[in-house]
């Protein structure tokens, strides 16, 4: 099966966010950000756990006030996934959450303050072995850069990032990653491409403020897809005006599409037409919901007729090809004698998938339980 990605990733240095490796060939980490009030500890903890359940490697939490910093302490005690504290304006908040076991500090060069304040944050991070993300955003560039460039440009985002990279270099601090996000795809992509040529540190990817679930997913897939295909990127966040859980799902779907990193079922399904012998759309939708808990990577093709069905099944772990009343079943690219009743496809296919997952994870004896 054609599963190897042809992408050659950019060489970068290695940092750790908690126990998650970032850069230097480590799996590209998928992260999201809570949208609850951080001072609502119960709601924030619940959302973090929901994100962890769908595979989030890292979760970012906004910490806008000292009260939020105190809440962060409680949140950290009740969660397991590495947490990034998102800090703007008041550098003292960064110093406070560092005391509470934060796994990474995100600072915004556009509003964190002068070099002396950055020095205080860096010395604290060094002392406690906490990495930093320099998070440049096209919507909050420094005033002098806006005066110079008149608008956000790739060169402006790059200059903002490099100013702070230089500060960290002068302070002999190399445990950091960098992002240069923008809401415009071309602006973000060109900014990252320029930055990738300038530094060796890991890059955190994102199209900021991408939009709602549908449009934002498309915009992020286009922008991040361009960068990832170039080998650029060590961690990513899909920024959606939607449930943060969707950000994780879309992030993994993008990585899965490029064969960079797979998690769970990769459904290969036809859009359906009058040749379909069963309801493809409802079958796929139902199986996606039922199998959300599956982590093991697996390709499952669900094709409604025999035009493309057999060909797709040949390169799938499990394949289904629509037939008159009974549909053909393939396992590891081989047509099986067993056929599926078109009126009971979802239950039958779920059982086969779960059995194969169990075999892959060695939870049951290695025998053909699906023949």
UniProtKB/Swiss-Prot annotation:
Catalytic activity: (2E)-4-hydroxy-3-methylbut-2-enyl diphosphate + oxidized [flavodoxin] + H2O + 2 H(+) = 2-C-methyl-D-erythritol 2,4-cyclic diphosphate + reduced [flavodoxin]
GO biological process: isopentenyl diphosphate biosynthetic process, methylerythritol 4-phosphate pathway; terpenoid biosynthetic process
Record Pfam families: GcpE
Domain of life: Bacteria
Cofactor(s) needed: [4Fe-4S] cluster
Name assigned to this protein: 4-hydroxy-3-methylbut-2-en-1-yl diphosphate synthase (flavodoxin)
Annotated organism of origin: Shewanella piezotolerans (strain WP3 / JCM 13877)
Keyword match Signal: no
UniProt entry tagged with the keyword Metal-binding: yes
Database matches in NCBIfam families: ispG_gcpE, PRK00366.1
Known pathway: Isoprenoid biosynthesis; isopentenyl diphosphate biosynthesis via DXP pathway; isopentenyl diphosphate from 1-deoxy-D-xylulose 5-phosphate: step 5/6
Keywords: 4Fe-4S, Iron, Iron-sulfur, Isoprene biosynthesis, Metal-binding, Oxidoreductase
Known role: Converts 2C-methyl-D-erythritol 2,4-cyclodiphosphate (ME-2,4cPP) into 1-hydroxy-2-methyl-2-(E)-butenyl 4-diphosphate.
E.C. no: 1.17.7.3
GO molecular function, one term: 4-hydroxy-3-methylbut-2-enyl-diphosphate synthase activity (flavodoxin)
EC top class named in words: oxidoreductase
Family: Belongs to the IspG family.
Segments forming a coiled coil: none
Positions with a binding annotation for [4Fe-4S] cluster: 270, 273, 305, 312
Listed Gene3D superfamilies: Dihydropteroate synthase-like, Sulfite Reductase Hemoprotein, domain 1
Cofactor remark from the record: Binds 1 [4Fe-4S] cluster.
